[in-house]
């Protein structure tokens, strides 16, 4: 992953001049460069797109990563609470809010479009440590998600350290049913 790619990713979401955000991406790149997180995040992003996003709950070291969020691996944005305009990319941070999802509606002061309220103020330092990404899926989607993951990694000619693939773990991604749900494994 190059610095140009990270800059382009920043500008696509937040516009030109969002250098503190770009700086955070560079720091996350440095923290994740030598581990297995990036391939897992790409896989998780593709899985969320394939299964409609909201039916796949991503847990673990993904939710505090801006890079994972911008790649689409998690809906959780770890930046401090803010508004961003999807139309003109105008950005406003709100230092008084506890969480971006609680911000009131706001029209963009630049173009008048409705702004997106986002941000949960999560630090990237907790990316250091064990690289675990856990996925929770509804019971009726468990088998299709397992099959999709096997196909995804098989197409990339990847091997795992456990032969054959487990029913609950594929290439470091742990699959679980929501708490209290019985069956499937």
Report residues per predicted region.
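Alpha-helical scaffold/interaction cores of sigma-54-like transcription cofactors
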Residues: 1-185
